[in-house]
């Protein structure tokens, strides 16, 4: 599947205000009220702006932070990490590679048995593709992750 980056004007037409704010303006949605923080479906999470596969439900865990938390991305090459010194803190921001969408942040306080990382990701930056729909939506190669 080929993924393409959309222009800002096109994104304004297809994303909700919150999705645009989070992905394009480096925003953060409210904790505990977003779509995927407590969601347990089996499938993959893709960049809402490009469709790039980012995370799998197999790597999702409950962290009590109020946002979806993952131990790792599907492939580290599809994300970018950069230093974020906003809000008086030093954190590591996570962005999608192609879309350059703000996804959230990665922290070193994840479960040790899962590698020790916690990717704290905004639901508004993600679209969930259920395992049952991976083939029809063009993500058939990711079915292997669920065997």
Curated annotation (Swiss-Prot):
Gene3D superfamilies: Peptide methionine sulfoxide reductase. Residues 8-131 form the MsrB domain. InterPro entries: Met_Sox_Rdtase_MsrB, Met_Sox_Rdtase_MsrB_dom, Mss4-like_sf. The active site is at 120 (nucleophile). Coiled coil: none annotated. It comes from the Bacteria. Its EC number is 1.8.4.12. GO terms for molecular function: peptide-methionine (R)-S-oxide reductase activity. GO terms for biological process: protein repair; response to oxidative stress. One of its GO terms (cellular component) is cytoplasm. PROSITE patterns: MSRB (PS51790). Keywords: Oxidoreductase. The keyword Ribonucleoprotein does not apply. It catalyses: L-methionyl-[protein] + [thioredoxin]-disulfide + H2O = L-methionyl-(R)-S-oxide-[protein] + [thioredoxin]-dithiol. This is Peptide methionine sulfoxide reductase MsrB. It comes from Clostridium perfringens (strain 13 / Type A).
């Amino acid at each position: 599947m080929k993924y393409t980056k959309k222009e800002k004007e096109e994104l304004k037409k297809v994303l909700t205000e919150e999705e645009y704010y989070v992905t394009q303006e480096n925003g953060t949605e409210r904790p505990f009220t977003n779509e995927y923080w407590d969601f347990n479906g089996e499938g993959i999470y893709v960049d809402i702006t490009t469709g790039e596969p980012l995370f799998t439900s197999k790597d999702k865990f409950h962290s009590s932070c109020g946002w979806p938390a993952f131990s790792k991305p599907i492939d580290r090459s599809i994300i970018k990490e950069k230093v974020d010194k906003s809000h008086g803190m030093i954190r590591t921001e996570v962005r999608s590679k192609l879309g350059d969408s703000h996804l959230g942040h990665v922290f070193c306080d994840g479960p040790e048995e899962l590698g020790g990382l916690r990717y704290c990701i905004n639901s508004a930056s993600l679209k969930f593709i259920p395992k049952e729909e991976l083939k029809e939506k063009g993500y058939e190669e990711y079915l292997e992750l669920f065997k």
